[in-house]
Amino acid sequence: MLSPTSVQVRRGEFVCVIGPSGCGKTTLLRAAAGFVKPSSGRVLRGPYPVAGPSREVAFVFQDYGRALLPWRTVAGNIALALEAGGVPAAQRPARIGAVLETVGLQAHAQQFPAQLSGGMQQRVQIARCLAQQPEVLLMDEPFGALDAMTRESLQDELLRLVHSQGLTVLFVTHDLEEALYLGDRVIAPRTGPTAQRPSVAAIIDVDLPRPREQLGTREHPTFVQLRRQLYQYLGRH
């Protein structure tokens, strides 16, 4: 449940939503995807209300293991998006090959999910989303279950993909540093005893140079300052 909230995500922007479990992060994301209808208010994409799922919007789930079909190969899992989108069969191999190259999985096209590491499985899910050529990418804690080194590698890969494809991203995370590293803006909720229902309490601009780099960006004085500011804010709310 979310209190009345107004959030605007601009075209080509990377916006992170951060907060503890139960603060409404996933509800906001699911409403943006058209998976659920808000009980009040509206969700708009451009000037049009979101009435349901759209090919222009792709959703990356946290649980990559359940998002992939174990009896389909990597290429077969990516083909799902093309089949659902009505892409002619003759055009699918080229589209699949292109996104596999984009995420660096060309050599694994005929492997099954169980033969891949967690990070590689998540890249398959991202590749499947890219295959549908979306304008908006919604991501629900996609790297939360991965080890630190894999998570940082995929963060950098995601930033490269977003920049090269001109995607708009709404990214949910509970990791404060991940939000600051990836985002152009960070949305923080108001929770705690003074909030009957979670609501958006702060939207923080992340004024850090791009391209970003794991060590340099995290040691940047602005990053350190924003981390302290956001940590103190979340601690109070």
Question: What kind of feature is each model-predicted range?
Answer:
Residues 18-20:
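The feature captures the beta-strand-to-loop junction immediately N-terminal to the Walker
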Residues 33:
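Helix-to-loop junction immediately C-terminal to a conserved catalytic motif
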Residues 41-53:
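Conserved ABC transporter NBD signature motif
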Residues 72-83:
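Q-loop/switch helix immediately C-terminal to the Walker
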Residues 83, 90-108, 160:
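Conserved ABC ATPase "signature" region
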Residues 112-116, 120:
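Conserved ABC ATPase signature
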Residues 131-135:
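A short, proline-enriched helix->beta-strand linker immediately N-terminal to the Walker B motif
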Residues 137-140:
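Catalytic Walker B motif of ABC-type/P-loop ATPase nucleotide-binding domains
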